[in-house]
UniProtKB/Swiss-Prot annotation:
GO terms for MF: lyase activity
Induction pattern: Expression is induced during the early biotrophic stage of development. Expression is positively regulated by the ABA cluster-specific transcription regulator abl7.
Function in brief: Alpha-ionylideneethane synthase; part of the gene cluster that mediates the biosynthesis of abscisic acid (ABA), a phytohormone that acts antagonistically toward salicylic acid (SA), jasmonic acid (JA) and ethylene (ETH) signaling, to impede plant defense responses. The first step of the pathway catalyzes the reaction from farnesyl diphosphate to alpha-ionylideneethane performed by the alpha-ionylideneethane synthase abl3 via a three-step reaction mechanism involving 2 neutral intermediates, beta-farnesene and allofarnesene.
Protein name as annotated: Alpha-ionylideneethane synthase abl3
Metabolic or biological pathway, per its Swiss-Prot or TrEMBL entry: Hormone biosynthesis
Keyword Iron-sulfur attached: no
Keywords, sorted A to Z: Lyase, Virulence
Domain of life: Eukaryota
Broadest EC class assigned to this enzyme: lyase
This enzyme's EC code(s): 4.2.3.-
Family classification: Belongs to the alpha-ionylideneethane synthase family.
Length: 426
C-alpha cells in the first residue's frame, strides 16, 4: 500500500502503509438466525461479534469539533463519507477538491438523520463549516458551479426538514405531494435528493475537467438510471425507513426486477457507446457503483449483518434499529399532525428560492393539481410496517409510471445518440 505524505499539497507516494487514521469501536449487529438458516450456514459459523474499524483520512479528524454528538458517531460519519466518496468517485486528480466533496457528504449525512442541526435558510455557517467555502473548494472555476451550489442547498433544505420537526411543515407536505405528480418530475426530484447530478459534476471537478458539463436531458437519463438501480436494490432499506423518496413507492413494485434489468442493460450499452470518450469514465463509474455495488462495499448497508445477502425483507428489529439511527439510517413514522408553518414556506419561496431550490422546484411545489384518486395526506411518514411514507398512488397512475419506465431506452437514445447503434445490436 502507499503513504500519503501530504493530503493538503497533493499526493506523494512511498512504498509503505497508507496513512489513514482509524478507530476501532462500534459494536454492530449480529446476523439474524433466519438469514443464517436461509443462507445454509450453521449458527456456529456466524460471526457473533462484528466490530467495525472506522478508517478515514486525517484531513477529517478535527471536523465536527463543536457538534454535540458522541465521538463514535462522528467517527462513523467520517468513515461513511470516505467510503462513499471512494465508491462513487474512485478516480481523482485533485485532492483538495476530493476532501471538499467528503465534507459535503459529511454535512449531508448529518442532515439525513439529525435535521435539527442543519438549516440552510439560516445562513452558511453550520457544524463548524462555512457552506459557501466548502462548495467553492469543490466547484470554484468549474462550468456548472452556480447550478451545483443551488442543487446542494436544495438537497439540504428538504433533507433536513425530513429528519426534523420541520417535517410537519407546509414545505415538506408540498414537497411529498409533488413527488407523486408525474414520473419525470419524480426523477428530477429524486435526482436532487440523491445528489446524483451533483456527484457527477463533483466527479468532473475532482478530475480537473473544469469545462465539461452535461445538458439537462443528459443529466435526466444518467440520474434516472442510477436512481432506478439504487432504489431497486434499496427497496427494503427504504421501507424500513418509511421513506418518501423511493422510486418503487410509486413505480409498480412488481416491476422492480424488470426495471433494474432494463436500467442495467442501458448502462452497459452506454458504457460501450461512450468508451472512446475517456473524460466520461468517472461519470459512468459513478452510475455503476451507485447503482448497486456500494450496498456490498459500504458499511452503511447491511450486507455483512444479513450474511452476504442483499434484499432481505425488513424485520421489526431492523425498523427499531432504524429509529435509533443504527448505521445512520432514519425512520419516518407517521404523526397525527396537520401541516403548518405556511409563513416559512412562503418566505422561502418568495425570498430564498433562487439560492436554496434547484430551478423548477418552486413550480413543482406550487402546482397542487393532484390526482383525485391518489391518497395525499396532511403529514407524511409510514403508518404501519412494510410501508413507504409518501403518497399512495392509484392503479391508473401506477400504470402510467410503468409505461414511463419502459420508455427509458428510447429516451436514452434521444439524450445520447451514440447509444442507438449499440442498443440495436441483436
Amino acid at each position: 500500500m502507499l503513504l500519503y505524505n501530504s493530503f493538503t499539497e497533493g499526493l506523494k507516494f512511498t512504498k509503505t502503509k497508507i496513512l489513514l487514521r482509524y478507530y476501532a469501536s462500534a459494536l454492530i449487529d449480529v446476523p439474524r438466525d433466519d438469514v443464517i438458516e436461509d443462507a445454509g450456514v450453521s449458527k456456529s459459523q456466524a460471526m457473533q461479534n462484528i466490530r467495525d474499524r472506522w478508517y478515514y483520512p486525517p484531513d477529517l479528524a478535527n471536523d465536527l469539533q463543536d457538534l454535540d454528538m458522541p465521538k463514535a458517531m462522528k467517527q462513523e460519519i467520517f468513515a461513511c463519507a470516505w467510503e462513499y466518496t471512494r465508491c462513487v468517485i474512485p478516480q481523482y486528480t485533485n485532492w483538495p477538491r476530493y476532501v471538499a466533496f467528503m465534507r459535503i457528504i459529511i454535512i449531508g449525512i448529518v442532515a439525513e438523520f439529525r435535521g435539527n442541526l442543519v438549516d440552510v435558510t439560516a445562513g452558511d455557517d453550520m457544524m463548524g463549516y462555512n457552506l459557501s467555502t466548502v462548495l467553492d473548494a469543490l466547484f470554484l472555476g468549474t462550468a456548472d458551479r452556480e447550478n451545483m451550489c443551488r442543487e446542494y442547498r436544495s438537497f439540504l433544505l428538504i433533507t433536513a426538514d425530513k429528519s426534523s420537526e420541520r417535517r410537519n411543515g407546509e414545505l415538506f407536505r408540498r414537497y411529498v405531494n409533488a413527488l407523486a405528480h408525474s414520473p419525470r418530475q419524480w426523477f428530477r426530484m429524486r435526482d436532487a435528493d440523491a445528489l446524483a447530478r451533483f456527484t457527477i459534476a463533483a466527479s468532473l471537478a475532482c478530475n480537473d475537467l473544469d469545462d465539461l458539463k452535461f445538458s439537462n436531458m443528459e443529466y435526466e437519463i444518467l440520474t434516472e438510471i442510477g436512481d432506478t438501480l439504487y432504489d431497486a436494490v434499496a427497496f427494503f432499506k427504504h421501507r424500513s425507513e418509511g421513506e418518501t423518496n423511493s422510486t418503487f413507492a410509486y413505480m409498480p413494485p412488481d416491476m422492480r426486477v424488470e426495471a433494474f434489468h432494463q436500467a442495467r442493460e442501458v448502462l452497459w450499452a452506454m458504457d460501450v457507446a461512450l468508451a472512446p470518450k475517456t473524460t466520461l469514465q468517472g461519470v459512468i463509474n459513478f452510475v455503476r457503483f451507485f447503482g448497486g455495488p456500494i450496498h456490498m462495499m459500504m458499511r452503511r448497508y447491511r450486507f455483512v449483518e444479513e450474511h452476504l445477502t442483499i434484499g432481505q425483507v425488513e424485520t421489526e428489529k431492523v425498523v427499531d434499529q432504524t429509529r435509533k439511527n443504527f448505521k445512520l439510517w432514519n425512520r419516518l413514522d407517521a404523526k397525527d399532525a396537520k401541516a403548518g408553518d405556511e409563513k416559512r414556506y412562503k418566505d422561502i419561496v418568495s425570498n430564498n428560492s433562487g439560492e436554496v431550490m434547484f430551478p423548477g422546484l418552486v413550480e413543482f411545489l406550487e402546482n397542487e393539481d393532484n390526482c383525485p384518486d391518489c391518497c395525499f395526506r396532511e403529514s407524511y411518514g409510514a403508518e404501519t410496517k412494510h410501508q413507504f411514507g409518501g403518497v399512495q398512488i392509484c392503479s391508473a397512475c401506477r400504470e402510467e409510471w410503468g409505461r414511463y419506465m419502459k420508455s427509458l431506452p428510447d429516451r436514452a437514445v434521444k439524450a445520447f445518440p451514440e447509444l442507438a447503434y449499440v442498443l440495436s445490436i441483436p
